[in-house]
């Protein structure tokens, strides 16, 4: 039955090793992707209201693809940049 199982998607596509080139660590990558996934989710939520406050997906999306998978593909293609913020010490 070769060819009947769809190729795995999600964290295996794109590979984690490729994604780690865009961030300093696995933890930074998780935060980076989660923030972008929240923006994509908010974009879809506001479409019904006619507001366009957030930027939608920057890559072609598949049917019922999760925002986190979309965010990871955007990161892998180099469509997003990370800017370090300075932490303020009290």
From Swiss-Prot:
Promotes RNA polymerase assembly. Latches the N- and C-terminal regions of the beta' subunit thereby facilitating its interaction with the beta and alpha subunits. Keywords: DNA-directed RNA polymerase, Nucleotidyltransferase, Transcription, Transferase. It comes from the Bacteria. One of its GO terms (biological process) is DNA-templated transcription. Transmembrane segments: none annotated. GO terms for molecular function: DNA binding; DNA-directed RNA polymerase activity. This is DNA-directed RNA polymerase subunit omega. It holds the Pfam family RNA_pol_Rpb6. GO terms for cellular component: DNA-directed RNA polymerase complex. The RNAP catalytic core consists of 2 alpha, 1 beta, 1 beta' and 1 omega subunit. When a sigma factor is associated with the core the holoenzyme is formed, which can initiate transcription. It catalyses: RNA(n) + a ribonucleoside 5'-triphosphate = RNA(n+1) + diphosphate. The keyword Metal-binding does not apply. Belongs to the RNA polymerase subunit omega family. Its EC number is 2.7.7.6.
């Amino acid at each position: 039955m070769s060819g009947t199982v769809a190729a795995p998607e999600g964290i295996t596509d794109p590979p984690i090793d490729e994604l780690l080139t865009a961030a300093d660590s696995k933890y930074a990558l998780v935060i980076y992707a989660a923030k972008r996934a929240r923006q994509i989710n908010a974009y879809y939520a506001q479409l019904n209201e006619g507001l366009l406050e957030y930027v939608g997906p920057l890559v072609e999306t598949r049917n019922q693809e999760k925002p986190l998978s979309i965010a990871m593909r955007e990161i892998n293609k180099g469509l997003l940049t990370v800017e370090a913020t300075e932490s303020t010490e009290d």
